[in-house]
Swiss-Prot record:
Active site: 362
Species name: Streptococcus pyogenes serotype M1
Cofactor mode of binding and number, as noted: Binds 1 Mg(2+) ion per subunit.
Protein name as it appears in the record: Bifunctional protein GlmU
Linker, as annotated region: 230-250
Amino acid sequence: MTNYAIILAAGKGTRMTSDLPKVLHKVSGLTMLEHVFRSVKAISPEKSVTVIGHKSEMVRAVLADQSAFVHQTEQLGTGHAVMMAETQLEGLEGHTLVIAGDTPLITGESLKSLIDFHVNHKNVATILTATAQDPFGYGRIVRNKDGEVIKIVEQKDANEYEQQLKEINTGTYVFDNKRLFEALKCITTNNAQGEYYLTDVVAIFRANKEKVGAYILRDFNESLGVNDRVALAIAETVMRQRITQKHMVNGVTFQNPETVYIESDVEIAPDVLIEGNVTLKGRTHIGSGTVLTNGTYIVDSEIGDNCVVTNSMIESSVLAAGVTVGPYAHLRPGTTLDREVHIGNFVEVKGSHIGEKTKAGHLTYIGNAQVGSSVNVGAGTITVNYDGQNKYETVIGDHAFIGSNSTLIAPLEVGDHALTAAGSTISKTVPIDSIAIGRSRQVTKEGYAKRLAHHPSRSK
């Protein structure tokens, strides 16, 4: 059995009120088009053809070389859109899935079941349908007394009886590929919309006494076509529920799953605990036994086993096992933390590698630095890495002790076991086993405070 796929992605999406093509709006971190394309992969199509139109280059860039593309210059209906794929698929033997690019909730399992139903029943066309409590706006499935599909009627063309029908057309179909393009040559624009309806091929097949079937979705949510921001929000809500449920089934604990935002490509190992209001985005991986507390935000990062991240932001960083971060820490892109590193409250790290068991507990900035293992970085330490034009590196050796309120002016190297005194400004190399003091001596002038305006004796 050879399968093909046509994805309809040419529309502007006027009701979205956006400069962005409709299919490029995101749901849980992926564009709607990407969600659809991933689901389509479940039928293993030999060839996928994406119909593009409005801002076509933007749409093409999302799928790149994963799909063939055809251009629909004028949007003259779904039938017209499918006609555009004729140059890619005409004459080929097999079954062709036609699906809209704005249906992000459709699953690969449902598409596979649709194809199997189509093949097993030897249909020339199979419609994916659903039962709607409120079918207004959808095309209705009209069956005869034997339950056979005889036609699909669009909302604007439906009579009073047809408008009461609850079974609706989801806009997804499977066709015998050759018969599809033969039938498309016979459809017209003689309807309320003045468009080429893809649904008209069903009546053509019926007139030729060819078999048309319908496969009913179990989950109505999968049929959702996103045409405005309201539907986009509904899709986001459903997708978030699916994602958190998947992770819970796989052994992840959520204290308040309704408040968590996790994107589609995030990976979470078993025995992770996630508190409320946590955001996980991009290609993030969370290792087993890790705890993410309330307010944590992580994007495109790898978090090792048994870490604790407390109300902190982590971007494009790698954390080994046993690392603790926060509260209120910020790990910026290019940060790597080895085993059992501790990054405490109000510490910012950027583009740096920090060795195992090193601690930076409070109020510190570490940028463009290579920090060894078992280093203590005192509160208020700053690596001065930027001169207004260029960035420079700071290197701190193993077991060094950086005193509180040290200012390290890069480029700079502090050797193994070296110490910088609290309050120092260090601008020259500190050799191994050395102590560097870069501050003025304290001068105490007894009694001088009485001369100052703030002293109580001055107010008499």
